[in-house]
């Protein structure tokens, strides 16, 4: 069975946002605080498609104060 990397990416970021109790609106505010300006539509599209860059992923993790990510497969 082939790995669906887009689905894994989407799941990874959504899990971390859920753990931090942060929705898209709050994420957008927090991203702006670190100098990253995104729209709701842009954030939702990137996350739901699972096609965001690793830079975007790191920015999101910084915005929710997540310093360590463990990927298990």
Question: What annotation goes with each model-predicted range?
Answer:
Residues 1-26, 30:
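A short, Lys/Arg-rich alpha-helix, primarily the initiator
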Residues 3, 72-73:
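Short acidic DE-rich linear segments
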Residues 30, 34, 63:
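Residues within the alpha-helical elements of helix-turn-helix
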Residues 33-51:
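Recognition helix of helix-turn-helix/homeodomain-like DNA-binding domains
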Residues 53-70:
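DNA major-groove recognition helix of helix-turn-helix/homeodomain DNA-binding modules
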